[in-house]
Amino acid sequence: MSGLVYVLNGPNLNLLGKRQPHIYGHETLADVERDCRALGKELGLEIRFHQSNREYELIDWIHEARETAAGIVMNPAAFTHTSVAILDALNTFEGTVIEVHISNVHKREEFRHHSFVSKRADGVIAGFGTQGYLLGLRRVAKLLDEAKG
């Protein structure tokens, strides 16, 4: 398996930096992508970075990742709480899955406390802002290094 990692972003994350900055901060998704690519290069990971407001596109990328990727770092956003379909897709992926949330979902509305994705995730990172993506990439890289021996 290669050092390829998919970084997948769910609905409304295209508005990062503009939507509720008091919760999600002022960094844009382009900033997150830039930082993920820079860290990926440092760690020897190839990054495929995607965002969609459509559930089926996220599922298609998960299916694509099955063939070549070592890991998925995913911020499913609102699909976290609703999507059995994304859970089912992730259950077909054999690599590492890290679930990321920019805000601490457990300090927010009750409905945000439930995650279908967590049922498959190898780890969950929440409340560290966009740094959570970088923590997720570091974890995938560490697991890859450990698997190499």
Swiss-Prot record:
It comes from the Bacteria. InterPro entries: DHquinase_II, DHquinase_II_CS, DHquinase_II_sf. Pfam families: DHquinase_II. Keywords: Amino-acid biosynthesis, Aromatic amino acid biosynthesis, Lyase. One of its GO terms (biological process) is chorismate biosynthetic process. Substrate binds at residues 75, 81, 88, 102-103, 112. It catalyses: 3-dehydroquinate = 3-dehydroshikimate + H2O. The active site is at 24 (proton acceptor), 101 (proton donor). The keyword Lyase applies. Pathway: Metabolic intermediate biosynthesis; chorismate biosynthesis; chorismate from D-erythrose 4-phosphate and phosphoenolpyruvate: step 3/7. The record marks 19 as: Transition state stabilizer. Its EC number is 4.2.1.10. Homododecamer. Catalyzes a trans-dehydration via an enolate intermediate. Belongs to the type-II 3-dehydroquinase family. This is 3-dehydroquinate dehydratase 2. It comes from Bradyrhizobium diazoefficiens (strain JCM 10833 / BCRC 13528 / IAM 13628 / NBRC 14792 / USDA 110). The gene is aroQ2.
